[in-house]
Amino acid sequence: MAIVKCKPTSAGRRHVVKVVNTELHKGKPFAALLDTKSKTGGRNNLGRITTRHIGGGHKQHYRLIDFKRNKLDIPAVVERLEYDPNRSANIALVLYKDGERRYILAPKGLVAGDTIQAGASAPIKVGNSLPMRNIPVGSTVHNVELKPGKGGQIARSAGAYVQIIAREGNYVTLRLRSGEMRKVLAECSATIGEVGNSEHMLRVLGKAGANRWRGIRPTVRGTAMNPVDHPHGGGEGRNFGKHPVTPWGVQTKGKKTRHNKRTDKFIVRRRGK
């Protein structure tokens, strides 16, 4: 994998920094594992905007990723690594011994030809998935389940990982990248290693159009709007003279947004503390 800075042949290329991975498959994806992906433009079924800054972008197919890793004790060979436009991580096409193919998240260090396996008896090896009760304390894992059998929900983006720091009874304690420490059932499965493509954060798009290709529309500051459009709008100069709020008047700095009290007991330490 290489970090390539483009030559300044135009204003739009001057600041572009690309992440080039020569190991990625250059052909088409595996058709049987593709699904349609329709554009919403950020609108709901009433045609009202529910998520701002969404619209346009290149047409894409969704890749069906196996987050559950529920083909147990059947070895699989990594056929190739592929680019996935729907996520920051790369994906790997694996062929199981029984002939079935699936996509999985490509962990760091996994290459074509490697053998992986899922199940309680799987060895501690990058790409293998097993219950966290069987993973040594101190190990780095990704694609971590919150409920047994539901599929991985934590640490799925490029370069993400979670560290197992303790095991007590039916629970393991995890340290997340945010600094949060939380308990999860030891029966939940996780995949050994960290998610690959960690250089993703180093890329520089270089121009506004590159975001438009990705379906991301501009974000306009509230203070640049009129009073009818935003609480920060209007007035002389750039000062809006009040506490920062969202377009709907909700405080935007320091206000807690978590409401799930039922699972508060599993959080040992909050993030950022």
From Swiss-Prot:
Q: Which segments show compositional bias classed as Basic residues?
A: 253-273
A Pfam family this protein belongs to?
Ribosomal_L2_C
- Which InterPro entries has this protein been placed in? NA-bd_OB-fold, Rib_uL2_dom2, Ribosomal_uL2, Ribosomal_uL2_bac/org-type, Ribosomal_uL2_C, Ribosomal_uL2_CS, Ribosomal_uL2_dom3, Ribosomal_uL2_RNA-bd_dom
Recorded GO molecular functions are:
rRNA binding; structural constituent of ribosome; transferase activity
Q: Where is this region: Disordered?
A: 221-273
The record's Gene Ontology cellular component field reads: large ribosomal subunit
Give the record's GO biological process terms. Answer: cytoplasmic translation
Q: Which PROSITE patterns match?
A: RIBOSOMAL_L2 (PS00467)
- Give the UniProt keywords, A-Z: Ribonucleoprotein, Ribosomal protein, RNA-binding, rRNA-binding
Q: How does it assemble?
A: Part of the 50S ribosomal subunit. Forms a bridge to the 30S subunit in the 70S ribosome.
- NCBIfam families (alphabetical): rplB_bact
Q: Which family does it belong to?
A: Belongs to the universal ribosomal protein uL2 family.
Known function: One of the primary rRNA binding proteins. Required for association of the 30S and 50S subunits to form the 70S ribosome, for tRNA binding and peptide bond formation. It has been suggested to have peptidyltransferase activity; this is somewhat controversial. Makes several contacts with the 16S rRNA in the 70S ribosome.
Name the UniProt record assigns to this protein:
Large ribosomal subunit protein uL2
